[in-house]
Amino acid sequence: EYTERMRKAGGGKLTLKKGTYRFQYSVCIPSNVTVVFEDGVVIENIFDTKAHIKPATAMWQLVPKNMTYKNKAIGKYNGTSNAKMIAKGKVVFDMNYIKGLSIIAVHCKNIEISGITFKGMNGNHYIEVNGAKNVKINKCKFNKAKKGSPQKAYVKEAINIDMADEITGGVGCTWAKQDKTPCVNIKVTNSVFQGMSRGVGTHNYSQTKKKKNIYHSKILIKGNTFKNLYDAGVYLMNWKNTKILNNRFIKNGKGN
């Protein structure tokens, strides 16, 4: 595939023209790759095929494809670096209410995601930011997710800030080391969140062998709108050196 050629070449640029693209499996993005989505691009997650093969865990994974075949191959921030996913105009990632994620950003660094509209989440997250450093998510829209309950199919954060920890089940990628790497310098700006449980947050925490808490740090949540969320706009758990600035919170906490 194109991104695998780019990995072997040391990087590159992939431009998707206007149209609907149906994903059954993950597209992997290696280092030094920019994916540009032109106006009118729709990425759909699908389930039903003649082969009835289950969909992948995520539509996009920020990881070199050759590493996904190896068990616990990547840890710390040593995965994909210097990668961008940029929308030019109206671009939609539609999960079609299939359980899974839109984007997995695990053990990576220097990542930018911009201008994308997400919809159709079911029981997971739109973006999993996990053990990552220097991630910018800007001018995105996160729309309605399928409702659940705390007992069943509870829809958590649109953007989950987490760490790989086998005790908490923080990440399900077999290629990721469960090394409790925290997130550092994560910026979520100028985005809109509406119609789900939470906007941005963490719902589990990890500790060292000596039972000391491990903290995500340098989190910036700025200039966003959180509207009609069942639970909370921002759910902080074990964050430090965090700034939450100039956001709008409208009719949140109504219950899932």
Question: Which ranges hold each PLM region?
Answer:
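Short, T/G/N/S-enriched strand-turn elements that build extracellular solenoid repeat scaffolds
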Residues: Y2-R7, R22-P30, N45-F47, K72-Y77, ...
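Right-handed parallel beta-helix
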Residues: E38-G40, S81-V92, K109-G120, K133-K147, ...
